[in-house]
């Protein structure tokens, strides 16, 4: 992966065609994310805790949009992000970003129609749920119960991505589940910051003195 990254960086630097440079930059981002995934695979089983903090979902959504919207546009498919939770969550931004990237990439490769990433309040009001769905054929009924097991895949892939995403969600105190298999709807459940502790509400705007 290091050699591939160096080659992509070289192409991005020496190419005079904007389209080639843009494609090289996109590929480089994918390689960097894959490197992170491999690293997580090596140590996720050793980590029992995660450095979580108060983050805004829109920050994670904006990063995901920047990474994926061009690829969805090239495929002629809409990618929609909607934050109706409108409150900070307690999560690890890097891990949450990788979980969403796995779900979005799978939707792009194997799904169809509009891919929607929707954050909303959980039923308990103490958490936030992020749903990733599309309008494709979905997941075979026989695979659904074991979809997060390593090696389980209905599309000839390694079957590592969803298993890792499941572990990453757990590592930051969240939960990744398959809500429905047809149409495919995955949910990521995360603890929300109570309104009484929300720094945007507790701390007044402007200077303190």
Spans of model-derived segments:
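Acidic ATP/Mg2+-coordinating residue in the GHKL
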Residues: 134
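Short beta-strand/loop element within the Bergerat-fold HATPase_c
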Residues: 114-126
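Short helix-loop "hinge" at the ATP-lid/N-box region of the Bergerat-fold HATPase_c
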Residues: 106-108
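Short conserved segment of the HATPase_c
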Residues: 139-151, 203-204
């Amino acid at each position: 992966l290091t050699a591939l990254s160096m080659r992509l960086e070289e192409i991005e630097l020496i190419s005079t065609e904007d389209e080639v440079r843009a494609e090289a930059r996109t590929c480089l981002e994918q390689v960097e994310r894959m490197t992170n995934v491999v690293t997580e695979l090596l140590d996720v089983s050793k980590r029992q805790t995660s450095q979580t903090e108060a983050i805004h979902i829109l920050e994670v959504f904006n990063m995901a949009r920047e990474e994926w919207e061009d690829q969805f546009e090239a495929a002629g498919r809409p990618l929609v992000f909607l934050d109706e939770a409108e409150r900070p969550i307690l999560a690890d931004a890097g891990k949450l970003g990788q979980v969403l990237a796995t779900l979005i990439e799978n939707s792009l490769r194997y799904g169809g129609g509009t891919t929607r990433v929707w954050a909303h309040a959980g039923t308990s009001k103490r958490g936030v749920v992020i749903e990733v769905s599309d309008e494709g054929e979905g997941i075979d009924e026989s695979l659904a119960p074991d979809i997060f097991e390593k090696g389980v895949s209905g599309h000839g892939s390694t079957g590592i991505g969803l298993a890792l995403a499941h572990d990453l969600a757990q590592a930051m105190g969240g939960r990744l589940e398959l809500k429905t298999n047809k149409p495919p709807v995955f949910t990521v459940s995360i603890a929300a910051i109570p309104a009484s502790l929300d720094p945007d509400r507790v701390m007044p705007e402007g200077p303190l003195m």
